[in-house]
Amino acid sequence: MPTIPGFSQIQFEGFCRFIDQGLTEELHKFPKIEDTDQEIEFQLFVETYQLVEPLIKERDAVYESLTYSSELYVSAGLIWKTGRDMQEQTIFIGNIPLMNSLGNSIVSGIYRIVINQILQSPGIYYRSELDHNGISVYTGTIISDWGGRPELEIDRKARIWARVSRKQKISILVPSSAMGSNLREILDNVCYPEIFLSFPNDKEKKKIGSRENAILEFYKQFACVGGDPVFSESLCKELQKKFFQQRCELGRIGRRNMNRRLNIDIPQNNTFLLPRDVLAVVDHLIGMKFGMGTLDDMNHLKNKRIRSVADLLQDQFGLALVRLENAVRGTICGAIRHKLIPTPHNLVTSTPLTTTYESFFGLHPLSQVLDRTNPLTQIVHGRKSSYLGPGGLTGRTASFRIRDIHPSHYGRICPIDTSEGINVGLIGSLAIHARIGHWGSIESPFYEISEKSKEIVYLPPSRDEYYMVAAGNSLALNRGIQEEQVVPARYRQEFLTIAWEQIHLRSIFPFQYFSIGASLIPFIEHNDANRALMSSNMQRQAVPLSRSEKCIVGTGLEGQAALDSGVSAIAEHEGKIIYTDTDKIVLSGNRDTISIPLVMYQRSNKNTCMHQKPRVPRGKCIKKGQILADGAATVGGELALGKNVLVAHMPWEGYNSEDAVLISERLIYGDIYTSFHIRKYEIQTHVTSQGPERITNEIPHLEAHLLRNLDKNGIVMLGSWIERGDILVGKLTPQAAKESSYAPEDRLLRAILGIQVSTAKETCLKLPIGGRGRVIDVRWIQKKGGSSYNPETIRVSILQKREIKVGDKVAGRHGNKGIVSKILPRQDMPYLQDGTPVDMVFNPLGVPSRMNVGQMFECSLGLAGYLLDKHYRIAPFDERYEQEASRKLVFPELYSASKQTVNPWVFEPEYPGKSRIFDGRTGDPFEQPVIIGKSYILKLIHQVDDKIHGRSSGHYALVTQQPLRGRAKQGGQRVGEMEVWALEGFGVAHISQEMLTYKSDHIRARQEVLGATIIGGTIPKPEDAPESFRLLVRELRSLALELNHFLVSEKNFQINRKEA
């Protein structure tokens, strides 16, 4: 079986390509810069550039919120042409953020990743559309490297038009003449000159009589705002720059595609659209009209290209050099004007390059914060491919045809793994064997079947459609198996059944077509694709548990997924372990002693805990590549996202209806689903107009128990247990004392009690809702240079221990997700015939309608593996060997477990896979046999502690005066129209009035409630309209509609007019 390529290899190879080739290409484009008098010339000598190794380590960059980058130095020379003197210096250009071996960059202490973008490849594309009369109109679209799309079309009268915008079109002879070709040259270089001669009349012939007339006509149509332009060299240059260079630049890939599609041989360095290209495009377009040639499929991957991290970084580097060029030009002119002697050091600043990359990593849509929920998430994030981003599509305008699966995706883009929601089909994931080729195409490996050579070849999408490719045959696992006579195959985007002798290529691996997430689902062939999609997404949301456990039933890729994620500590040299603890491992070998630091309670950006545990004892000899310590969610070097728990599929008093899950309290007391979460809180100190803010533990008017954990500096002590509302950092902000700002009662009390007006306002960092835990790290980052614009920052990290509770979300690996609805005592849970209580009870109705039967196979095989102490690794699509192959695998294992453990209930022939179980409350058996087994269940990041919320008081919206929405804003829950109907249905008049007035948007009633609460007494009823009604009246007035409303007195039924 061939080795699977590294899952992070695509990102890292792209960055290496940028360092090796992209930097040099862009530096060679840097022009020689002269002053206005052409006496001084500045130039870069790009042959001798160098990147300096960073002074800090990755871990320190994350901890101190710095950028892990390398300094770029280039030799530059300043030449005085009068004396022919040259001054050469090595200058600092700027910092380039580096990428680690996992494909991540660290910018301002945050792990970031640049995902690959799929764009339409530049070139020429032919398509046919029906007009309003039902007649086919053939068009040829020239897609440039920068996204411009000029079109050529031929109508039913065989007239050829050039269309640059949707509304305007012009005869093809005009742009051809404007590009420098006269009518005679055009007719000599086309295959159908009679068509070109048939449609121009005398007026049009005059327009193309000379290049000047053609340029004027073209400029009138597309670039002129008004009036009659006059031909000039500046107008010609402007048209050349705005249209023929910016909108018609093909680029390196576009020139290659154009030459292949039109069968021409223009040199690769001619990256702009030439008159010869236009004439060849028109020839093919006329041939399409006459039924010759084939139309292009725009959604085929051969017509797409990958814009990788190398391309994006190279574009940003080129942009930075353009900014540097403008800065150097301005500095030279300023130095000459002020009669100063410039040097290369004085001319060049590092600001353009540094700020360009900071802006790119911080603001570009394709640069994203690395999702580090668990190890699987980290490697999957780097293999995403997106149609979105600059130059791409948007979620609201993309059609269904673009989102759909295309036959060319086979083995390149996973047909299952995509995002859900508005971006479905637009954000995909690369297949595990796919790689990005030199020309930006996605290549897939195949095993070549011939007598001369039997080797693996990587083919781009434009080549494999010419071969007969065997799809899913027994040779995909073992080359020695006898070939079948007739096999399913793929040829020219069609799936056929042909003889084995006609096969050219075959697949190399059963997982070749899937992404990493889909490849970790056992028995995936028995699941509906929608549920497999949910499963591959939910595995990325699994929380690393405090006690991880390997899955009993897996697919075999768990080891490589854990290895490539980089969370485990790997021995880089062979040697002997001489010391080990929770902080480091010391290795002795080759006369050197190496100390390997371990990650201890590091926070991910999803607040999960990244921690490494040593696996090697002291005195053990190890080899290179051996695992020294397991990381988060890994055991023995294999991915371990969940737990193997005993599940039963049966209803239980309605507590597991509609995807609810019933669990045993053993999962809590045994710390089965306990996870650690780390939250970071920070506060800054600024210099205000009244003076600097102070960090202190002397906070007036605060209760002592809130300050109990502060040290003498006013910062919480390490190891303290913190509850909601406690002070983490004590801070006072100076303010001007104004007696007039206080209420009269407040001033009277201050005068009686002798309390002085405070000159400082308390602005402490307090622990918000749901943040209780243990302080594990406190860091005070001092400002450098004493600048008031660079404030001091204090960071406090708090560790939380979370057991599973009601409201948490759990899921299996087959899209079977649910919310914990009730936690039963273990004695009340249903129990097996040997007395073992089950851990979870799932609803059986969730299986048949969702068609994810793979969980049944996993459940039964997991029970057999648990009893036999075995682990299984199942390849997908085993049904291709024989029918019912999965069932024939599971049932013998259950039978073997039943015999070895002398438990006949494990496999009962009447209902294999099911068993009679008993009600824990009564001891009576249930009426029907129940499917029981060991399933691998994950605890997801959607936890009730992060979501539950109640509002007592909070902020209100300025316009509607209604409570804000959302937990972060202390918002409330909206009582809408249907909720009011429900309240009315129960006849709760007072509750309805409260919801619509006091607790919502009645300003005066809210104030009266506050007063009545303080003084005592009954709360008065609101008499006027709430603010939302007044807002409606004002909006109607803005539309010149007056709405009057009246309140009728209950006593005398008189109308009392109230203004809105």
UniProtKB/Swiss-Prot annotation:
Record PANTHER family: DNA-DIRECTED RNA POLYMERASE I SUBUNIT 2
Family the entry assigns: Belongs to the RNA polymerase beta chain family.
A GO BP annotation: DNA-templated transcription
Keywords: Chloroplast, DNA-directed RNA polymerase, Nucleotidyltransferase, Plastid, Transcription, Transferase
The keyword Nucleotidyltransferase is assigned to this record: yes
Oligomer status and interactors: In plastids the minimal PEP RNA polymerase catalytic core is composed of four subunits: alpha, beta, beta', and beta''. When a (nuclear-encoded) sigma factor is associated with the core the holoenzyme is formed, which can initiate transcription.
Taxonomic path: Eukaryota, Viridiplantae, Streptophyta, Embryophyta, Tracheophyta
Gene3D superfamilies in UniProt: 2.40.50.100, 2.40.50.150, 3.90.1100.10, DNA-directed RNA polymerase, beta subunit, external 1 domain, DNA-directed RNA polymerase, subunit 2, domain 6, RNA polymerase alpha subunit dimerisation domain, RNA polymerase Rpb2, domain 2
Protein name: DNA-directed RNA polymerase subunit beta
GO cellular component term of the entry, any: mitochondrion
Coiled coil start-end: none
Pfam families for the chain: RNA_pol_Rpb2_2, RNA_pol_Rpb2_3, RNA_pol_Rpb2_6, RNA_pol_Rpb2_7
EC identifiers of the protein: 2.7.7.6
